[in-house]
Amino acid sequence: MNAVKIPTTQPEPCEIELKLALPVSDPSGLAHRVFITSLLARRKSTRTLLHNTYYDTPDQLLRQQGVALRVRRKAHSGKPQRLQTLKTEGASGSALSIRGEWEFAVPSEALSLEILRANAPWARIDPDARIFAALGPCFVTHFERTTWLVRRRDASTVEVALDIGKIEAGDKSAPLCELELELLHGEPQALSEIAQQIAGRIPLLPLGQSKSERGYALAKGALDAPVRADPARVRARMPVADAAHRVLREMFRQFTANLHALRVSDDPEVVHQARVGWRRFRSAWRLFRPALESAGAPDWDALKPLMTFVGELRDLDVARTETLPPFTEDYTAGNPNRTKDWQTLLEAPAAAATLQRKSARFALEDPAPGATLLQTVFWLERLPRQPADNAPDPSTPPLRQWGARRVGRMHQQLESALEDDAGSVASQHRIRIEANRLRYAIEALRGVPPGDVGLQYPALNRKRQKSPANTGLAGLLGVRIGP
């Protein structure tokens, strides 16, 4: 197995940590399941109560700079200990995070500017202490932490921490139930192997948001909101493998963030964005696969039952929120009896959607999908990339040239589907699939060609107009990349 690659340019001291979300429906039962896993059952555990107050300015200047600042009260035995911690943003968006971390004991729960200036990059963040003067509490977390130390034969040491409690911001609160694996010594591969051992018994979801990020989202009223696409920035001359890593990682982040939200949110848009995220990810893998043949993608078959539930739930949500409502006035026409019948009709897809949402959530409590997603996290980190200090390989075409060929090939596949269109359900389905693959490929390579993408191929558009399968896809079929 290839080793997990960790960038060497991260600030020191740094924290290398894997965050995993756990179901919140039965925390006590879940804790018992964690305790009896074969990895942890015979190891000594330590329980600690933690209360953390996070600080920022009213306009959240620290958050804008990717900085989290907290004071932690730690109660274990004897006198409570207080720690002031500053964390800086590192490899964001992934459950595997590498962040700068500076933590020191303080005499009270008041912030210490002296310690900040002496032991952290505070001079760059706040050279004149104006930010410090404006700092105030913005949210808190308090939870019970159970920790185990796992020492391996390869000399690596990993701290496994189970956190169960809540996040509070003003009058808002949200449950907190997660597992953290922190690498204390050794190679990051240890995190992968230990996490996989636990994932075989416990339903886990990779968690790309830190506690501080969730605290900010809670304060804003946006916790577990739908996460939309945020296309990764790629450049025309960057190596293809680097672009693939950046693009796939962003799409996987969207997918897993919406799965996490789906466990507690009834918002139809969460379901929609989860399915969009998965389609974007699979389409991008199809786009970049020729350049990553040696990477050996995980087997994603374990996700099929879950994604079937998600797809069927999306169909029901569309029926009850988009397809049927416009017909209300035409059907009822002010007739009370017809209005009653119409309401009865609308209740059917709503009830079916409720049942299907429960099925999707039940699927997320099976360990198999989480284990597959966890494999994907580390697979993404193992993707080949060019070291920052290496010159580009002249034998490898840059992204723009490579992308032009790949998107051109997808154009040909779509054109072939349009030419073969017989008006059947199967042929129309094929056209929709090819069109969506092309759309997601163009989105993945956004920013590569000069100027604005959107050049039309008139012949393809004329064929599209003749095919009922492609209504609403104008502008997707004629985009090209490259000269």
Which positions does each model-derived feature cover?
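Function-determining surface determinants
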Residues: 2-483
